Regions:
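N-terminal non-catalytic accessory region
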Residues: 2-202, 206-267, 277, 284-286, ...
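Glycine-rich, aromatic-lined ligand/substrate-binding cores of catalytic
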Residues: 271-354
Length: 418
């Protein structure tokens, strides 16, 4: 009996060692070494998924000196989901949520911070779960990058290995997320080294602005070595008109239980909102974007608009961020620019004498329901400004978020990868 057990134990140990050698793994990462101790080339390029505004989970831990309502938690022992948590987006509870997720702008440092006693983190950097589903319960209403991530898995990719997510604090603009870009650079270099080939970036919405900023900071030699292509989905290259409504009278994003004016104060604190106002390098300087009985506002009138809204912090935020991508410098990598069209999209807002504390009449134009067509197609200006290819692909009838679920989008991504 004892001998048999020793033989069995030895056999199991041998099997484990063989499996370890065959798998070629060390510290959880594939070695993929070939002749000459050089990395083998993977049959497919690694992929980094980058979400847009509101496009990944946020978590919070509380130890607050006070609360806005007696039902609000003042202290928590662990981190909990702050976004997306549908249970917090209902009357009364939303007051707690707004007070936790808001930012406080410092006019001296020109930076923002969470309220006292609120610690907000971005979970799952390097993983895909926090952007596949915005709601950890995986309700369909919170489905975001799941279809694309699952398609990649079906093609042979592995979550957390050669397909990874790069979530970030989307309340802020790139100038306040320097640690994020350092972590992103290191992750891209690691993935490219492991695979023996450069990475493909797939970004959505505001995530494309983040990636353009990131690429503009990198030397061309770095981009040549580590980036194969940049797939931009629904990019607001020149800003979006919708953000004007957000800062003026609030926007409930179609959630009927939330009053736009109720959520306006919180939405204004997000620096990324002011960053994404329409830009004068693209929008006609004489086009009226906001109309009231006494005043018309164009892209040249933001200072006056913020003043009339009594929102000085907003004007400072815009000044802090407007130059980050104002020139729309080419990314210096192959770009595939996919954009939706044919969906009524907000392009101007008409207010009554109750401005700004009233819902506007919305003037519609072309786009994907969120990003105006004028903005989404600005990648065309790079066609003759960089040697790398720039491809534009219109997706008629594709809505801004639903484009991530569309078979045409998935098929296009596969064509780029393989």
């Amino acid at each position: 009996m004892g001998g048999r057990h020793r033989v069995t134990a030895f056999s199991l140990l041998t099997l484990v060692l063989l499996l370890w050698l065959v798998s070629g793994r060390s510290c959880g990462q594939p070695l993929r070494k070939c002749a000459g101790n050089k990395p083998c080339q993977s049959p497919r390029p690694p992929v980094v998924l980058v979400p847009g505004d509101l496009g990944n989970q946020l978590e919070a831990k509380l130890d607050k000196p006070s609360v806005v309502h007696y039902i609000c938690y003042k202290k928590t022992d662990t981190f909990f989901t702050l976004w997306l948590n549908l249970e917090q987006l209902v009357p009364v509870a939303i007051d707690c949520w707004m007070d936790n997720i808001r930012l406080i702008y410092n006019r001296t440092t020109h930076t923002t911070s969470s309220p006292p006693g609120v610690n907000i983190t971005v979970p799952g950097f390097g993983q895909t779960y926090s952007l596949e589903y915005l709601d950890p319960s995986k309700r369909s209403v919170g489905m975001y990058f799941f279809n694309i991530a699952q398609a990649l898995v079906d093609w042979g990719y592995t979550r957390g290995d050669d397909v990874r997510g790069a979530p970030y604090d989307w309340r802020k603009a790139p100038n306040e997320n320097k640690d994020y870009f350092l972590a992103l650079q290191q992750m891209i270099e690691e993935m490219a080294t492991n695979a023996g080939r450069p990475v493909v970036l797939i970004a959505h919405s505001m995530g494309n602005m983040y990636m353009l900023y990131f690429l503009n900071q990198q030397p061309q030699a770095w981009k040549d070595k580590y980036i194969k292509a940049f797939i931009a989905l629904g990019a607001p290259w020149a800003g979006v008109a919708k953000t004007l409504r957000v800062i003026t009278s609030g926007d409930n994003n179609g959630i009927p239980v939330i009053r736009p004016l109720k959520i306006r104060s919180q939405q204004r604190t997000a620096v990324s909102t002011s960053w994404l106002l329409p830009y004068s390098h693209t929008w006609p300087k004489d086009k009226v974007l906001i109309q009231t009985p006494t005043t018309n506002y164009t892209v040249m009138d933001y200072q006056r608009l913020y003043s009339d809204l009594d929102f000085k912090d907003g004007w400072l935020m815009r000044q802090d961020t407007e130059s980050l991508l104002f020139d729309l410098t080419p990314p210096g990598v192959a770009v595939h620019c996919l954009y939706g069209s044919g969906i009524p999209t907000s392009e101007a807002f008409q207010y009554t004498s109750k401005f700004p504390d009233v819902d506007p009449t919305v003037v519609m134009g072309d786009g994907d329901g969120t990003v105006n067509l004028l903005s989404a197609t600005q990648c065309k200006r790079w066609v003759r400004r960089q040697k790398q290819s720039v491809t534009l692909q219109e997706l008629p009838g594709n809505e801004h978020v639903n484009m991530l679920l569309n078979v045409s989008t998935v098929a296009y991504i596969k064509k780029v990868l393989f």
